[in-house]
Structures are given as C-alpha cells and as structure tokens.
Amino acid sequence: MDKPKPKPQPEPYGLIPRWFMEQTLGRDCGYKQWLRTTFGGDIAERLIADYYIGGSAEGDAVFWQVDSADNVRTGKIMSYDPATGKRHKGEEAYTDWVHSVMRREGALPEGWQLKQCLYGEHLLKRRPNEIVAVAEGAKTAHVGSALMPDMVWVAVDSMLGITSERLEPLKGRKCIFFADEGRGYEEWKERLGPIAHGVGFQYLLSDFVEEHAVLSGGDIADMIGYEELRERNE
C-alpha cells in the first residue's frame, strides 16, 4: 500500500517588527482628523486603537495588517483629504506598502516574502461569537464599525482578496460580505460559495450596496451622509 503523501508545508513568510508599527501609532494624519470630525472623538479613537491606524512621517495614513497571532504582516500607506475623507487625487495622490518602502531602503532581509492577512484579523479572537462583516477596503471597515459596531468588521483589501487562504480565519464563523457595487459584487457572488464550503464558514452576500449605490464602483463609505454625521458631532 502506498504511503499517504505528506501535507505540503505552508510557504514561509516575513513579518514586520512590531516596534516599527508602534512608532507610527502616535502620529496624526489627515485620515484620523477626518474620523474625528465625522464620527466624534470617542468613536474615532476607538477605531484608531482597534485597527492600529498609524500615521507616516509625511502625514499619510498607515493601515496595518495584523494577523490572529498579533504578527504584523505589512501596512498600506495612503493619503487622504482631512476635510472629505477621500483619497487625494492628482499630484497629491500617494499609495504604497510598508514592506515595499523597507525593501527599497534595504531594511528587509534577502528572501523576505509577503503574505497578506485580513485587515482587522486580530479583532476576530477578541470577539469570537459575533457576526463578521467583510468589506473590500479598510475605510469601509472603519465606517461599518462606527455605524454598526455589533459586528466585527474586517477587509480583504481588494476585490480579488477573496481567497481560501485569506479567509481561513473565518472558519466556524457567521459572516456577511459587503462587496463594492458593480464588478466586485458579481465576482464575489461567483467565488464565495466554493470558498465558504472549503474553509467552513456560513455567509450571506449583501446586495445593499449593489441596490443602493448611485456611482459605479461605490461602497458603503461612499453612501454615508457625512455632513449629517458631522453636524451631530459638533
């Protein structure tokens, strides 16, 4: 009888030193300012603390990916307008990754490999019995957590972030997926069934954004009446 083949070992991946993340947490940035003016100080500070929202030396937001073992995988650096909460356009636009910056500066060892995790994954173990809301982007997760805090909000970073590997931490959980309007919704509708079956989680794909979005490619964050929220917090 043939011996069973050994299970393939997971590919090794690199981590970012935790102190590197921690030094960004005390820095302010336009995105944090927008959170405070929109949702009020208490909610904003909860979001900033829960999601480890950092700031770069240049004033950009850093959205850290911290896994369920509290390891820092990487961070996404993005510039936001503090008045509108929207990403800067044109010459002011900036998007980068912490691991890419460190690699360019020679601060990572040779052979360092990235393995992304769910944004907000570290929150799952803190709230093991609550429904998980899965969004595409970090900002949508923040807005969702501010307005619907009874669910644990995480994000997959992009439309194509729906993979068995990325969603493995959802095993045994009940989940609601909020895809962005348009192609994202159709992509998730096609892919989620087999992934949920393989990983072992229950899910509902919400069509709220698909039914109510005005702009193509819209998400929950695009649909919120921020002016009304600001007036309530003034």
Outline where the language-model segments fall.
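TOPRIM metal-binding catalytic domain and adjacent DNA-binding surface shared by DnaG-type primases
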Residues: M1-R73, L123-P128, E231-E234
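Phosphate-handling DNA/RNA-contact segment within nucleic-acid enzymes
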Residues: V62-K171
